[in-house]
Regions:
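Small-residue-biased structural context
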Residues: 1-165
Length: 165
């Protein structure tokens, strides 16, 4: 990755994949019918981190791409890729927000059986779909950004990104 923007998005992808790995571990240890102790330090930290990630990382990451990068990519002829990524963003953000909404009450009251079953299903759907999305962006979007952005535009976008974080 040559541009600051591509490197920053790559780093955000790595952080997202690390969070997804923690979520997958939790889901793998507990069947949909037998939820975890939400007061255990690891589970409590994951539930907190999920809410924070949706509000402060995933949503803003998608918004930055859609407002600052995708119009430039469309102008450069990458409209099909952009259309696919925008569609995935909408689906992924809805899943992530659902998961965060299910995690919030569990942080203080634990998981009721039906709430855990819904959390488990939403978590499983999100981990698979978001990991596949990250792969697409790593293989298609980031190289396209490197090819598209000159140093001046990269610097200007880096300033915008820093202000949004």
């Amino acid at each position: 990755m040559q541009t600051h923007i591509a490197r920053t998005l790559h780093d955000e992808h790595l952080a997202t994949l690390a969070l997804l790995a923690r979520l997958e571990t939790l889901l793998g240890r507990h069947a949909p019918t037998a939820g975890p102790d939400a007061t255990s330090p690891a589970v409590a930290a994951l539930l907190r981190d999920l809410g924070r990630a949706v509000a402060q990382e995933i949503g803003p990451h998608f918004a930055f791409e859609e407002t600052e990068l995708f119009p430039r990519l469309i102008d450069a002829g990458a409209g099909e890729m952009v259309a696919l990524l925008v569609e995935e963003h909408a689906e992924l953000l809805a899943l992530a927000q659902e998961l965060a909404a299910l995690a919030a009450p569990a942080r203080t009251g634990g998981f009721a059986p039906e709430a855990w079953a819904r959390f488990h299903a939403a978590g499983a759907a999100l981990t698979g779909a978001l990991a596949a999305h990250v792969d697409k962006e790593e293989m298609g979007l980031l190289p396209a950004i490197d090819d598209l952005l000159d140093a001046e535009t990269d610097s200007a976008l880096a300033m915008i990104l820093a202000q949004q974080r």
